[in-house]
Regions:
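Ferredoxin-type iron-sulfur electron-transfer modules in oxidoreductases and energy-metabolism complexes
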Residues: 2-29, 77-202
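Short secondary-structure capping/junction motifs at helix and strand boundaries
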Residues: 17-21, 33-35, 59-60
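A short, compositionally biased
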Residues: 43-49
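S4-like RNA-binding module at protein N-termini
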Residues: 52-75
Length: 202
């Protein structure tokens, strides 16, 4: 079963046994089943963000929590589950954090506002395959926040860089490139994310 299915089973067990998770884990703010965030359960939306045994999304590389399976753990293993830890992602309840900060960063500049022509123009502007692929690499970021959770400074610079580069590499995005980057970095700083010091933990 998947890691999130395990959490579903745990919650069902807590409800069935009438247990209060507050008594299970001192300091927990919940008085019912353990709250955790999820949506697609297919590794697309990034909502299932958890810190598992000291790693963002757990022991597997390049997967989200919902893609993690319990076969990665052994019987009797102690599994420590924590929410993302960053000033930019305040805890709402249990394992759920508020990731609206990423939306606010995108609202600051993650778009193209200049006229880019009509529908036919989209096919008339030639873009090399290499440029399109590089732009798609940035667009592949699902905004889960693992880069922030892993960074000792709580920096969102990798997220911002992915969004800026996915647009700036395309001809339509070059016009506002500098303005976009400055606005998004300023919003990131305003929201309390740390600075990048090139530790490459992300």
């Amino acid at each position: 079963s998947s890691f999130l299915e395990m959490l579903d089973i745990l919650n069902e067990q807590l409800i069935h046994e009438g247990m209060d998770p507050v008594a299970v884990e001192k300091g927990c703010q919940s008085s019912g089943p353990v709250s955790f965030d999820h949506d697609c359960r297919e590794g697309i939306c990034g909502a299932c963000s958890l810190y598992i045994n000291g790693r963002a999304h757990g022991p597997d590389d390049e997967v989200t929590t919902c893609q993690l399976h319990m076969r990665k753990f052994h019987d009797g293993d102690t599994i420590t589950i924590e929410p993302w830890r960053s000033k930019g992602f305040p805890v709402i309840k249990d394992l759920v954090v508020d990731r609206q900060a990423f939306d606010k960063i995108l609202q600051a500049g993650g778009f193209i506002s200049v006229g880019t022509g009509g529908v036919p123009d989209g096919n008339a502007i030639l873009i090399s395959h290499e440029t399109a692929e590089e732009s798609m690499d940035g667009a592949a970021c699902i905004g889960c926040g693992a880069c922030v959770a892993t960074c000792k400074n709580g920096s969102a610079m990798l997220f911002v860089a992915a969004r800026v580069s996915s647009l700036a590499l395309l001809p339509q995005g070059k016009i506002e490139g500098a303005k976009r980057a400055k606005a998004m970095v300023a919003k990131m700083d305003e929201l309390g994310f740390g600075a990048c010091t090139n530790t490459r933990a992300c």
